[in-house]
């Protein structure tokens, strides 16, 4: 089954309890195919001098793979409780989380490997001054799928590139360790 980050309209319409949120978010972000598809498989980067950089991003053309590297990110109940306590996500209503909270948790879980939770929350709050959660989340999914367009805010575009570069660096580290153990 091919699993990629869901768009807003694909997120659950029903409000979810904490255990359901944990199951759903972890399932979405932990799928190896999702990570390969969204973070690495079609990312544009190559260090060869012959390639021209994209004018908008400065990133070169190329292809990346994960080679079965385990890049799982885990979201726990304690993390969600801390996010609520520190106002990084809204408090659940009658212990139920709504679609915008689930979308924010997916983004936080993916971005937290590169940026601090405070940086992510501050940036999301600033972006929400000029756009809505649905549009911002869909731009994020587009970027992770390498389908961004001219309406995609640069801050989202560069955040996604940072995540992809982080995973490429992790992949290179694993490959280096593997080659050193084999020699």
Model-derived regions, located:
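Basic helix-turn-helix/winged-helix DNA-binding cores
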Residues: 1-121, 125
């Amino acid at each position: 089954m091919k699993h990629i980050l869901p768009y807003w309209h694909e997120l659950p319409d029903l409000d979810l309890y904490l255990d359901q949120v944990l199951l759903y978010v972890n399932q979405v972000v932990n799928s190896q195919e999702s990570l390969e598809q969204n973070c690495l498989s079609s990312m544009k980067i190559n260090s060869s001098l012959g390639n021209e950089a994209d004018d908008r991003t400065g990133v070169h053309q190329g292809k990346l793979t994960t080679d079965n590297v385990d890049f799982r990110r885990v979201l726990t109940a304690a993390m969600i409780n801390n996010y609520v306590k520190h106002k990084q996500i809204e408090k659940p209503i009658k212990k139920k989380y709504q679609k915008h909270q689930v979308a924010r948790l997916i983004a936080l879980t993916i971005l937290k490997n590169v940026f601090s939770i405070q940086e992510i929350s501050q940036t999301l709050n600033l972006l929400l001054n000029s756009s809505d959660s649905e549009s911002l989340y869909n731009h994020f999914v587009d970027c992770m799928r390498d389908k961004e367009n001219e309406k995609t805010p640069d801050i989202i575009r560069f955040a996604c590139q940072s995540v992809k570069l982080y995973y490429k660096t992790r992949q290179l580290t694993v490959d280096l360790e593997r080659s050193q153990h084999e020699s």
